[in-house]
Curated annotation (Swiss-Prot):
It comes from Paraburkholderia phytofirmans (strain DSM 17436 / LMG 22146 / PsJN) (Burkholderia phytofirmans). Keywords: Isoprene biosynthesis, Lyase, Metal-binding. The keyword Lyase applies. Its EC number is 4.6.1.12. HAMAP family: IspF. GO terms for biological process: isopentenyl diphosphate biosynthetic process, methylerythritol 4-phosphate pathway; terpenoid biosynthetic process. This is 2-C-methyl-D-erythritol 2,4-cyclodiphosphate synthase. A divalent metal cation binds at D10, H12, H44. SUPFAM superfamilies: IpsF-like (SSF69765). The gene is ispF.
Length: 159
Protein backbone atom coordinates (compact mmCIF):
# COMPACT_ATOMS: atom_id res chain seq x y z
CA UNK A 1 0.00 0.00 0.00
CA UNK A 2 1.04 3.55 -0.71
CA UNK A 3 0.41 5.86 2.26
CA UNK A 4 0.63 9.64 1.94
CA UNK A 5 0.65 12.22 4.74
CA UNK A 6 -0.49 15.78 4.10
CA UNK A 7 -0.24 18.83 6.32
CA UNK A 8 -2.41 21.91 5.94
CA UNK A 9 -2.47 25.36 7.49
CA UNK A 10 -4.65 28.44 7.20
CA UNK A 11 -5.23 31.69 9.06
CA UNK A 12 -7.76 34.48 8.62
CA UNK A 13 -8.30 37.82 10.34
CA UNK A 14 -11.41 38.39 12.46
CA UNK A 15 -13.49 41.36 11.32
CA UNK A 16 -16.93 42.79 12.10
CA UNK A 17 -19.80 42.23 9.69
CA UNK A 18 -19.02 38.65 8.64
CA UNK A 19 -20.41 35.36 9.94
CA UNK A 20 -17.99 33.09 11.79
CA UNK A 21 -17.98 29.72 10.03
CA UNK A 22 -15.59 27.01 11.21
CA UNK A 23 -15.85 23.39 10.12
CA UNK A 24 -19.06 24.25 8.30
CA UNK A 25 -20.68 25.38 11.56
CA UNK A 26 -21.92 28.95 11.95
CA UNK A 27 -20.80 30.06 15.40
CA UNK A 28 -22.49 32.98 17.17
CA UNK A 29 -19.87 35.72 17.59
CA UNK A 30 -19.58 39.46 17.01
CA UNK A 31 -16.94 39.00 14.30
CA UNK A 32 -16.26 36.61 11.46
CA UNK A 33 -13.31 35.61 9.32
CA UNK A 34 -12.20 37.78 6.42
CA UNK A 35 -11.66 36.01 3.12
CA UNK A 36 -12.61 35.66 -0.53
CA UNK A 37 -14.82 32.65 0.20
CA UNK A 38 -16.67 32.01 3.46
CA UNK A 39 -13.15 31.94 5.03
CA UNK A 40 -13.70 28.63 6.85
CA UNK A 41 -10.18 28.35 8.22
CA UNK A 42 -10.57 24.71 9.32
CA UNK A 43 -11.93 23.41 6.02
CA UNK A 44 -9.24 25.34 4.14
CA UNK A 45 -6.50 23.69 6.21
CA UNK A 46 -8.03 20.24 5.66
CA UNK A 47 -8.40 20.89 1.92
CA UNK A 48 -4.74 21.94 1.75
CA UNK A 49 -3.69 18.80 3.64
CA UNK A 50 -5.63 16.54 1.27
CA UNK A 51 -4.27 18.18 -1.88
CA UNK A 52 -0.77 18.13 -0.38
CA UNK A 53 -0.89 14.43 0.50
CA UNK A 54 -1.87 13.65 -3.10
CA UNK A 55 0.93 15.94 -4.41
CA UNK A 56 -1.74 18.01 -6.18
CA UNK A 57 -0.69 21.44 -4.96
CA UNK A 58 -2.78 23.52 -2.60
CA UNK A 59 -6.22 25.08 -2.26
CA UNK A 60 -5.18 28.23 -4.14
CA UNK A 61 -4.11 26.23 -7.17
CA UNK A 62 -7.54 24.64 -7.47
CA UNK A 63 -9.80 27.40 -6.08
CA UNK A 64 -8.03 30.72 -6.67
CA UNK A 65 -8.90 33.66 -4.44
CA UNK A 66 -8.64 35.87 -7.52
CA UNK A 67 -11.37 33.93 -9.37
CA UNK A 68 -14.76 35.65 -9.03
CA UNK A 69 -16.61 32.32 -9.20
CA UNK A 70 -15.23 31.46 -5.75
CA UNK A 71 -16.27 34.77 -4.14
CA UNK A 72 -18.31 33.87 -1.07
CA UNK A 73 -17.92 30.15 -1.85
CA UNK A 74 -19.10 27.59 0.69
CA UNK A 75 -15.93 25.83 1.84
CA UNK A 76 -17.85 22.59 2.31
CA UNK A 77 -18.49 22.58 -1.44
CA UNK A 78 -14.76 23.17 -2.04
CA UNK A 79 -13.84 20.34 0.36
CA UNK A 80 -16.20 17.94 -1.42
CA UNK A 81 -14.72 18.94 -4.79
CA UNK A 82 -11.20 18.44 -3.40
CA UNK A 83 -12.18 14.96 -2.20
CA UNK A 84 -13.70 14.12 -5.61
CA UNK A 85 -10.45 15.11 -7.33
CA UNK A 86 -8.18 13.03 -5.09
CA UNK A 87 -10.62 10.12 -5.23
CA UNK A 88 -10.50 10.30 -9.05
CA UNK A 89 -6.70 10.15 -8.75
CA UNK A 90 -7.04 6.84 -6.89
CA UNK A 91 -6.81 7.92 -3.25
CA UNK A 92 -8.98 7.29 -0.22
CA UNK A 93 -8.77 9.09 3.11
CA UNK A 94 -7.76 7.09 6.17
CA UNK A 95 -8.20 9.87 8.74
CA UNK A 96 -8.12 13.59 9.46
CA UNK A 97 -6.67 15.26 12.57
CA UNK A 98 -6.91 19.01 13.05
CA UNK A 99 -6.54 21.89 15.48
CA UNK A 100 -8.23 25.29 15.52
CA UNK A 101 -6.43 28.03 17.46
CA UNK A 102 -8.74 30.80 18.68
CA UNK A 103 -8.63 32.90 21.83
CA UNK A 104 -12.40 33.39 21.49
CA UNK A 105 -15.10 32.30 21.07
CA UNK A 106 -15.16 28.98 22.87
CA UNK A 107 -15.25 26.28 20.21
CA UNK A 108 -15.78 23.17 22.35
CA UNK A 109 -19.60 23.28 22.07
CA UNK A 110 -19.28 23.18 18.27
CA UNK A 111 -16.64 20.46 17.82
CA UNK A 112 -19.05 17.57 17.27
CA UNK A 113 -20.92 19.50 14.58
CA UNK A 114 -17.62 20.25 12.84
CA UNK A 115 -16.59 16.60 12.98
CA UNK A 116 -19.95 15.49 11.60
CA UNK A 117 -19.76 17.97 8.70
CA UNK A 118 -16.21 16.99 7.77
CA UNK A 119 -16.99 13.27 7.99
CA UNK A 120 -20.09 13.70 5.81
CA UNK A 121 -18.21 15.75 3.20
CA UNK A 122 -15.39 13.20 3.00
CA UNK A 123 -17.55 10.08 3.21
CA UNK A 124 -15.85 8.98 6.43
CA UNK A 125 -17.14 7.61 9.72
CA UNK A 126 -16.98 10.40 12.29
CA UNK A 127 -14.54 8.27 14.32
CA UNK A 128 -11.89 8.99 11.67
CA UNK A 129 -12.18 12.77 11.99
CA UNK A 130 -10.72 14.71 14.92
CA UNK A 131 -10.96 18.42 15.68
CA UNK A 132 -9.20 20.01 18.64
CA UNK A 133 -9.82 23.52 19.96
CA UNK A 134 -6.83 25.41 21.37
CA UNK A 135 -6.05 28.94 22.51
CA UNK A 136 -2.79 30.79 22.03
CA UNK A 137 -2.57 31.55 25.76
CA UNK A 138 -3.10 35.26 24.97
CA UNK A 139 0.18 35.40 23.03
CA UNK A 140 0.63 37.16 19.68
CA UNK A 141 -2.03 38.15 17.16
CA UNK A 142 -4.06 35.01 17.87
CA UNK A 143 -3.93 35.64 21.60
CA UNK A 144 -5.11 39.21 21.05
CA UNK A 145 -8.11 37.85 19.15
CA UNK A 146 -7.08 39.33 15.80
CA UNK A 147 -7.52 36.08 13.89
CA UNK A 148 -8.08 32.33 13.94
CA UNK A 149 -5.67 29.66 12.72
CA UNK A 150 -6.17 26.02 11.78
CA UNK A 151 -3.77 23.15 11.18
CA UNK A 152 -4.62 19.75 9.74
CA UNK A 153 -2.98 16.41 9.02
CA UNK A 154 -4.46 13.83 6.66
CA UNK A 155 -3.46 10.27 5.81
CA UNK A 156 -4.30 9.16 2.27
CA UNK A 157 -4.10 5.63 0.91
CA UNK A 158 -3.42 5.04 -2.80
CA UNK A 159 -5.91 2.40 -3.91
Amino acid sequence: MDFRIGQGYDVHALVPGRPLIIGGVTIPYERGLLGHSDADVLLHAITDAIFGAAAMGDIGRHFSDTDAKFAGADSRVLLRECFARVKAAGFSIANVDSSVVAQAPKLAPHIEGMRANIAADLGLPVERVNVKAKTNEKLGYLGRGEGIEAQAAVLLIKN
